[in-house]
Amino acid sequence: MIVPFYKSDNRDFTIVNGDCFDVLPQFDFKFDMIFADPPYFLSNGGISYQAGKVVCVDKGEWDKGGSPESIMEFNRKWLSLCREKLKDNGTIWISGTHHNIFSIANVLTKLGYKILNVITWAKTNPPPNISCRFFTYSTEFIIWARKCPKVPHKYNYELMKAINDGKQMTDVWRLPAIGRWEKSCGKHPTQKPLALLTRIILASTDEHDWILDPFAGSSTTGIAANLCGRRFLGIEQENIFSSLSKVRREEIDQFDVRLDYINRLNDLKYLPNLPISSEPDTLYGNDLPF
């Protein structure tokens, strides 16, 4: 039996503390969209440059790579579980770098997903390359794929066009890395910016849709989902980050904080029904089974 670590009062944000390999098989529910930020397998004792300091890039044991075969099997296992949790017209977004994204694309194809786009996130403020022996790493990739090759997926074309000054949105997104204001409650070592998740959610979901994140971290996906008027389930194995997710969600119950976030996220200005309160008038059915 699944017992949520935290569920918001209006039930639009749920965190389950556990390993997604154990949690996902335990319930029957279909999601409209999945966002996944799986391990990049790049914690190898290297160094980087952040906020004017040289820092170790090791994120934790969960990010240490194994053999190519073990990484491929890891990706096959979680992507298979996620496919079972998607509606037939649902889509999945997966972020990565060259360390893992090619393995993921290979597995997606073998499992029957249809890859729609590979988004290049071009960071407007990347850290410098301190070795000066190759180009600065300034991009990450996000694969967008749908579950079924022949079932039409959801894409909010006109909204994306409006956000892009009336022109078709391209597959290169120039967005900053995470800002200090996004770490007000604490931080996760691989935390994604709200601007990135907001655009992903607005592109491929509708109001009140359900979004799953099997590697939730500090639940940036969930915060962005709620700011966009969507509902969220996150699965996170580290208790410290499940706790951080709870604090972050409770923070946006404060009207002034929510309004500040909305004002900072440019894409939200184009949302027809902007949810400036976290308290809906009614619950919208199709709730999680726990």
PLM features: what roles do these ranges have?
Residues 157-160, 256-266:
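Short, flexible loop/turn segments with low-complexity composition
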Residues 28, 112, 250, 256, ...:
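Short, flexible coil/linker elements and helix-boundary hinge sites characteristic
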Residues 110, 136, 228-229, 252-254, ...:
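Short alpha-helix boundary/capping motifs
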Residues 1-244, 284-290:
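Core catalytic lobe of class I
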Residues 1-10, 246-262:
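Short, conserved SAM-binding/catalytic segment
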Residues 271-290:
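Acidic, low-complexity intrinsically disordered tails
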Residues 17-22, 262-269:
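Conserved SAM/SAH-binding loop
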Residues 163-167, 266-272:
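Amphipathic alpha-helical surface "interface" segments used
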